[in-house]
């Protein structure tokens, strides 16, 4: 079996997938992993074959800034547009059995659609449900906003060229793949009881870390609360 992973080059998107890729390799599954060059060592350490892709977002230092709600869908779609042909050049010659990606890594959606293989979406955070819509804050922006006009044009192009589902703002943030993996405990997910069998909950995926961290737990006997600001506050 051959599975392709397609993830945008950001720690919060790549890191949760690495233990999954490593476990799949241990089970004899061949993994082709597409992301940006800075993640080469981390990916190769899992046993996956690493394929670097171009990132328009990284090269342009894309930052929607205060207008994030308007601009982020176009940023994600443009990122997919910049790398999809590189990915397909490899996968058309070495066809995968499925493509794994997350909501922001829509080149994976396009690759699965173009190759007509299952689309597996991985959720590193809360998936949308009848009681929680990740798209809701983004839907307050009118379709006439220049960033939304750009996003709509890209979505239309992808549907026509790659036969992908129309990647509307709601589809980007509230959509699901053919099969879905949530790296959270089910009891923490609002509306989890509404999902059917194509959504599985693996719990948090913690793999080996190569970082040298000299921080130690304080020995004062007090309860400890850990806050992670993630990639949002660390330039992706």
Task: Give each language-model segment a name.
Residues 14-27, 39:
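Short amphipathic alpha-helix
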Residues 6-18, 233-236:
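A short, glycine/small-residue-rich beta-strand->loop->alpha-helix junction that serves as a flexible
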Residues 2, 26-236:
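Nucleotide-sugar-dependent glycosyltransferase catalytic domains
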């Amino acid at each position: 079996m051959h599975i392709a992973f397609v993830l945008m080059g950001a720690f919060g998107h790549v890191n949760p997938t690495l233990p999954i890729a490593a476990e799949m390799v241990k089970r004899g599954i061949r993994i082709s992993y597409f992301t940006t060059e800075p993640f080469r060592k981390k990916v190769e350490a899992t046993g996956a074959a690493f394929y670097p892709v171009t990132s328009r977002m990284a090269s342009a230092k894309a930052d929607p800034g205060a207008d994030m709600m308007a601009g982020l869908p176009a940023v994600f779609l443009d990122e997919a547009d910049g790398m999809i042909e590189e990915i397909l050049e490899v996968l058309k010659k070495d066809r995968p059995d499925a493509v794994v990606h997350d909501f922001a890594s829509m080149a994976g959606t396009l690759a699965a659609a173009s190759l007509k293989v299952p689309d597996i979406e991985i959720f590193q955070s809360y998936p949308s449900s009848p009681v929680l819509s990740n798209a809701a804050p983004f839907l307050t922006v009118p379709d006439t906003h220049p960033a939304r006009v750009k996003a709509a044009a890209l979505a239309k192009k992808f549907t026509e060229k790659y036969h992908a589902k129309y990647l509307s703002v709601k589809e980007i943030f509230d959509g699901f793949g053919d099969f879905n993996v949530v790296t959270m405990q089910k009891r923490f997910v609002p509306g989890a009881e509404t999902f059917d069998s194509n959504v599985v909950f693996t719990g948090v995926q913690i793999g080996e870390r190569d970082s040298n961290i000299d921080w130690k737990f304080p020995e004062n006997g007090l309860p400890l609360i850990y806050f992670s600001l993630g990639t949002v506050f660390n330039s992706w």
